[in-house]
Amino acid sequence: MAQAKKGGAPKKGQKTRRREKKNVPHGAAHIKSTFNNTIVSITDPQGNVIAWASSGHVGFKGSRKSTPFAAQLAAENAARKAQEHGVKKVDVFVKGPGSGRETAIRSLQAAGLEVGAISDVTPQPHNGCRPPKRRRV
């Protein structure tokens, strides 16, 4: 017998619970910039995500996700969502080697968020995993 699943999309006529507006004046912006995508998450001081956006979420596909312009739009989108929750000041944590790092920080400032400390938290291996092989074009 098939059992009813919990969660999922609400059925027609059912009321959905509206996500409550948090009032967080100070937060942290985590920018993860890889070679393929850029993800911007804005969290409260405890680390709970308030707003997020990524290059793919904004509407880019394929190799265009890795461009600085896509990172700029993702950061603006996340900043706009976070400002609805009352975020005014953020500390920025940047991770990864991607091309959208600086652009994302600049667009957070341009969107109206006050940027405090900027720190690079890219993980450095102490000779851990073998890196991918060199590309030969």
Swiss-Prot record:
Basic residues: bias regions: 8-21
One GO term (biological process): translation
Pfam family of the protein (one): Ribosomal_S11
Function: Located on the platform of the 30S subunit, it bridges several disparate RNA helices of the 16S rRNA. Forms part of the Shine-Dalgarno cleft in the 70S ribosome.
Family: Belongs to the universal ribosomal protein uS11 family.
HAMAP family named in the record: Ribosomal_uS11
Protein name: Small ribosomal subunit protein uS11
Native source organism of the sequence: Mycolicibacterium vanbaalenii (strain DSM 7251 / JCM 13017 / BCRC 16820 / KCTC 9966 / NRRL B-24157 / PYR-1)
Gene expressing this chain: rpsK
